[in-house]
């Protein structure tokens, strides 16, 4: 399962603070880079999102909890919506329903 993990640094948090924590957690092995399928920072910094692959939500929590005192998180499970299959399904539903 994929999870969309939006993040925003708390006010007063610096790049150095985030950098130190990132390296600390990396060295402890808690970042699980094998689960991070994408990591994007928004223009201007201090915010962005990650796409994390995990079987269970608690596996995502294991990654983000060590950052919760300096970063706010908003996490949502994601489901892929294949475009062509979705169009065909919508056409079928509209034909049957109306």
Positions of the model-derived regions?
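Conserved, structured core segments of small domains
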Residues: 1-98
